[in-house]
């Protein structure tokens, strides 16, 4: 029996506000444990929450960016549960009236585009963080408690681990462009749970789902889904049944393990938050927030293709992160050719960032010095090979491209007389290569070009070397 996988994703995104959603405590990552707290975060008796207006506006902006309808009337609710990182024994969330509903984003997998529906986007507060020690006790940090979150719940439209990966990449990109979050999984500002079920191909009814947690990277989301697909298929094929449960992905083994039997909404005993009034959003407020949304990746991608003549693949890669796309645009503004800038950013720059585990702003590279280097290549001042040395110097130490070329003595040798002298000496020492060339062996030319480049430490003008080599060999 063959099965179809059905996946829905729940993504939590921390909003980049200065203070928490219901208190005045700072909402910044990396502070000493239990220092970013107030009596509201600690759940002290008699204290009252005060709603952070900017968090609401960030939620509206994110919802609009993923094509959600914004509620005219929304409210907050208490989600009741006890856990050490939740001092109040309830979480303020949104239950039946979320701030955004009925959205969608478009993904592309294997050259095929597909719309993934968004059920809802709602606001809530984050919980604290438990650290479990090897000594039999746990440590609780309340700093994260009360940090504003949006939870984005997809429709069960995703059919594979690859589609889930593409959805998360696209969602991260869109949220990043809006500026409402850093969406850094390594810092916990973007987290994902996956609801996974399988059903026989052709069956309309959904199978029993399991919720998968502890997915701390996009790759782990993919691996967790792939493992869970196989596990559920093996259970059904052996005559067993799938239990509705919450499972943990174990990164060390690549497997999932049981955490608990899955709760339903009734277990949380939701009821309206009595300490917060309902929220009414008028058209004027919505339009003001909509005007703050910048050009999003899909539109920017189309502009790169239509206006700059870039291939679709280049446009997609360049717009995947806002930092890369903004850097590309600034490089063009500094006078670089679009295709050359694209090639460098997608090639050498991306390879360097991956190898060094850095982001663009953590290097010495700027749009101005990258554009300056590209202009030097176009002017024939340096070769593409030498440009790689210049690039590495700029990336590591910054500075001006032209000055680096002068200081390092990297100007391309284009003096015909000097090159003829070098070529003549190399031909004198490689007479067999001349014979091979005249016998139709083209590899001989490549070998001789290599010898010239070696003699000039890569600074000879390659097209001129080819031209002069042929001329000199034909004279002999």
UniProtKB/Swiss-Prot annotation:
The keyword Zinc is assigned to this record: no
Catalyzed reaction equations: L-glutamyl-tRNA(Gln) + L-glutamine + ATP + H2O = L-glutaminyl-tRNA(Gln) + L-glutamate + ADP + phosphate + H(+); L-aspartyl-tRNA(Asn) + L-glutamine + ATP + H2O = L-asparaginyl-tRNA(Asn) + L-glutamate + ADP + phosphate + 2 H(+)
Gene Ontology biological-process entries: glutaminyl-tRNAGln biosynthesis via transamidation; translation
InterPro entries in alphabetical order: Asn/Gln-tRNA_amidoTrfase_suB/E, Asn/Gln-tRNA_Trfase_suB/E_cat, Asn/Gln_amidotransferase, Asn/Gln_tRNA_amidoTrase-B-like, GatB, GatB_C_1, GatB_Yqey_C_2, Gln-tRNA_amidoTrfase_suB_CS
Taxonomic superkingdom: Bacteria
Gene3D superfamilies xrefs: 1.10.10.410, GatB domain, N-terminal subdomain
An annotated Gene Ontology molecular function: asparaginyl-tRNA synthase (glutamine-hydrolyzing) activity
EC number from the UniProt entry: 6.3.5.-
UniProt keyword Ligase present: yes
Keywords: ATP-binding, Ligase, Nucleotide-binding, Protein biosynthesis
Enzyme class, first EC level, given as a word: ligase
Pfam families, per the entry: GatB_N (PF02934), GatB_Yqey (PF02637)
Entry-linked PROSITE patterns: GATB
Its job: Allows the formation of correctly charged Asn-tRNA(Asn) or Gln-tRNA(Gln) through the transamidation of misacylated Asp-tRNA(Asn) or Glu-tRNA(Gln) in organisms which lack either or both of asparaginyl-tRNA or glutaminyl-tRNA synthetases. The reaction takes place in the presence of glutamine and ATP through an activated phospho-Asp-tRNA(Asn) or phospho-Glu-tRNA(Gln).
Sequence similarity: Belongs to the GatB/GatE family. GatB subfamily.
Subunit architecture: Heterotrimer of A, B and C subunits.
UniProt protein name: Aspartyl/glutamyl-tRNA(Asn/Gln) amidotransferase subunit B
Species whose genome carries this gene: Listeria monocytogenes serotype 4b (strain CLIP80459)
Gene assigned in the entry: gatB
